[in-house]
Amino acid sequence: MASMVHQLKVEDFDEFKSVFDSDPVGRKEAAKGHVMSRSVDDPNVVFTRVEFDSLEAAKAFRDRLVASGALDQVTVLTAPTVVELVENVTY
């Protein structure tokens, strides 16, 4: 499985979430789903993982996201990075 991960610092989480949910870059058409987490130390630091069927789909979406300018409204702490699942262990 392929995913795109990134870490952002937002000014207002509720406003960010509203824009994210409006899906301005077409995430729902390209991806299988996503997981979003917030830092307990700073709830305006957001971690997002978006899951895709393939590395190619993840890379294409990452490129579209970067080109869209959607990230210009936030502070990017970790740039959108395409990753491949290596191991998933449950304890």
Where are these regions (language model features)?
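Short S/T/G/P-rich N-terminal loop/turn motif that feeds into the first structured element of a domain
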Residues: M1-Y91
